[in-house]
Amino acid sequence: MKAPIPHLILLYATFTQSLKVVTKRGSADGCTDWSIDIKKYQVLVGEPVRIKCALFYGYIRTNYSLAQSAGLSLMWYKSSGPGDFEEPIAFDGSRMSKEEDSIWFRPTLLQDSGLYACVIRNSTYCMKVSISLTVGENDTGLCYNSKMKYFEKAELSKSKEISCRDIEDFLLPTREPEILWYKECRTKTWRPSIVFKRDTLLIREVREDDIGNYTCELKYGGFVVRRTTELTVTAPLTDKPPKLLYPVESKLTIQETQLGDSANLTCRAFFGYSGDVSPLIYWMKGEKFIEDLDENRVWESDIRILKEHLGEQEVSISLIVDSVEEGDLGNYSCYVENGNGRRHASVLLHKRELMYTVELAGGLGAILLLLVCLVTIYKCYKIEIMLFYRNHFGAEELDGDNKDYDAYLSYTKVDPDQWNQETGEEERFALEILPDMLEKHYGYKLFIPDRDLIPTGTYIEDVARCVDQSKRLIIVMTPNYVVRRGWSIFELETRLRNMLVTGEIKVILIECSELRGIMNYQEVEALKHTIKLLTVIKWHGPKCNKLNSKFWKRLQYEMPFKRIEPITHEQALDVSEQGPFGELQTVSAISMAAATSTALATAHPDLRSTFHNTYHSQMRQKHYYRSYEYDVPPTGTLPLTSIGNQHTYCNIPMTLINGQRPQTKSSREQNPDEAHTNSAILPLLPRETSISSVIW
C-alpha cells in the first residue's frame, strides 16, 4: 500500500529540517563524514556481535524506516584503519549479514577487525560515519582479554551493581536470560549479601576483598557471549580537606642551613579519596608561587605518591634551593587543597650559627664510650689489673713491717682415715693444697699452728699472740670446721675478738662447697657480721685448684704484697743445716721429742723401750706440711706420767727450739742424763686442756 502524497511531503520536510541542526565535521565528494563514532565494539573471537549504524543513534533525528521511506539508501564499507581504502561489503547472508540498520556477525573472526562505515544517501544528500570493531582472543589461562574489560568503582561499605554490559541484542523480551557469574574466571560460592537480578550482580555492602574481575556468561543460540568487568574498591568519598603531616599545621617549623649549601624542604600530606581528582599540593613564598620567583635556583620537585590504599594517598613535594643565599632565607608555606578546603603550614629557612655541637657531642660520646669500656674491663678484670699493677709498681705494706708472718692459717685437722667421699676434696684442699700453693708457689710465710706453735703459756694466749704477729687471718671453712665450731677460739679470747671487731687484722674466709645446710652455719653468718675487714672467697671444688683459676688470683689479691721470689720447700734438713724456713722448724714435733726424751731419761728401762718404739712409729707417719724426725735418746730415768692425748707443755732448750743441735757431740754420743738435766715435764692446767687439739 502506497503512502499518501501529503504524508511523504511532510516526512521529507521533517527529515530535511533535522539535518539542518547537525554541524558538519567533514565533507568529501559532497558527503558529510562524521569520522569514527565514539562507541567501539570489542568482542572475543567466536562470539556473535551486531554493529549498528551510528547515524540513526545520535547524528540524525530519524530512524532507518523513515530514512528508507524518504528515499535514502544505506550502504556499508570496510577499511583497515583511518584513511585506508574503503571497499563495499559483500554480505554472504550466513556468517555476516545486513539486517536493517545493522551488520550481524555469527560468529566473529579475527580478520573481522577494522572500521565499518555506514553511508545514507540519495541523489542530493550524503552522510557517513565509521564504527570500530575489534576482535580479540582470551589471555592465556583466562576467560577474558584484559584489553576488552569494563571498569567499575565502588566505595567501601556501600552497595554496588555490576551489569552484564552490551547484551541487549542477545536478550529475548519474552524470556528471562540465564546468566552465569564468575570471579576471576572461577565459579564462586557467593555470600548472602550478594544478589543476582536479571542481568546485574548486586553487592549490598562492598568489602575490600570484593576487588577483582567479574565475568558474566550468556548463551545465545549456539554461541556464548561473555562480558568482564573489573571492580575497584575505594574508601568512602571524603568530606574533609587534606591533612598536613609535615610541616605541622599552626606551628612554625625552623630549618637551619648554611649559606652556599643546598636546602631541601619537604612537605607531606594525606589526601582522602576524592574521586578522580588528583591531589593538589604546592609551595609558596609569601604571596608568590615558586615558579613566579626570579631565582632559578629555587624550584619544586614533582609530586610523589608515598602510599596509596583504596584511593587514599600520602603524597609529598620538595622545595629545593640549590645554593642558599641571604635572599633565600625566610618563610615558605606548603599548601594542600581538595574540593572540601585548603590547609597550609610554614617553614622558616634560617641561617645556622657556627656551633660545634656535633663535634662536641661526638667527643663527649667517644669519651663516655671509652669510660664505659674501661669500667667494664675493670669490673671484669679488676683482680688481674690490680695484680699486674702491684707486681710492677706496688710497694710492700708498711703497717705490717712488725709482723712476722704473712698469714695465720686456721683450719680443722682431720685424719685422712676419717675423710669421706663428700668432704674428702674439701679436707685435702685445706690440709694439703692451700698451704702448699701459698708457701711453695707464691712464697708467703704462713703460720700453721700444727707446725709452728711454740707453747709459752696457755693455748688461747699462744694463738692470740701468733694471730697478732700475722698480717692476715685465713679461715678455711670446711664442713668439719663448721661442725666443730672451729671459730669459737676467736670468740673466747678477748684480744682475738677485739682484733676482728676493730679491724686490726684482715680476715680471709674461704668457704668450701655449700655450707648452708650444715649444723652451726647460723653462727658462721653471725661471725661474718662481727668481722670488720672480711673477704669471703668461694672454693668451688677441684676446678679451682688450677693455677690460673679466679680463686688463686682473688686469694693472691687479698694477701699482703711483698717482693719475694717463690721458694720451694724441701724435706726437713739436717740439724746442722739452715734452709729457707730454718726459723720455722716444727716446734710441736721437736718439743714433743724433747719432752719425751726428758721423761724417758729417768724411766724404767722396759717402759722406755716400749715408748721408744711407739713414738717412732707415730712420728714417721705422713705429715701434711713437713716431715721432721728426731732421734729420742734410748735411756732415761724419769717416769712417764704426763703423756696423754692432750697438749703437754714442757721446758725446751733454746738450741733445740731453734732447730739446732749441739756441735760438740752427736745426740748418739751424748749422755742422756746430761742432755736432759735441765728438762722436766710441766703438767697443764685443766682450763688449758679443755680446747680440742684438732682445731688450729
Curated annotation (Swiss-Prot):
Catalyzed reactions: NAD(+) + H2O = ADP-D-ribose + nicotinamide + H(+)
Subcellular location: Cell membrane; Cytoplasm; Cell projection, Axon; Cell projection, Dendrite
Signal sequence, renumbered to the chain: 1-18
Domain called Ig-like: residue spans: 19-134, 143-232, 242-350
GO biological process per UniProt: negative regulation of exocytosis; positive regulation of synapse assembly; regulation of neuron projection development; signal transduction
InterPro entries: Ig-like_dom, Ig-like_dom_sf, Ig-like_fold, Ig_sub, Ig_sub2, IL-1_rcpt_fam, IL-1RAcP-like_ig, Immunoglobulin_dom
Residues carrying covalently attached carbohydrate according to the record: 63, 122, 138, 213, 264, 331
CDD domains: Ig, Ig1_IL1RAPL-1_like
Alphabetic keyword roster: Cell membrane, Cell projection, Cytoplasm, Disulfide bond, Glycoprotein, Hydrolase, Immunoglobulin domain, Membrane, NAD, Receptor, Repeat, Signal, Transmembrane, Transmembrane helix
Role played: May regulate secretion and presynaptic differentiation through inhibition of the activity of N-type voltage-gated calcium channel. May activate the MAP kinase JNK. Plays a role in neurite outgrowth. During dendritic spine formation can bidirectionally induce pre- and post-synaptic differentiation of neurons by trans-synaptically binding to PTPRD.
Free-text comment on this protein's domains from its UniProt entry: The TIR domain mediates NAD(+) hydrolase (NADase) activity. Self-association of TIR domains is required for NADase activity.
Similarity comment text for this entry: Belongs to the interleukin-1 receptor family.
Protein name: Interleukin-1 receptor accessory protein-like 1
Gene name of the encoded protein: IL1RAPL1
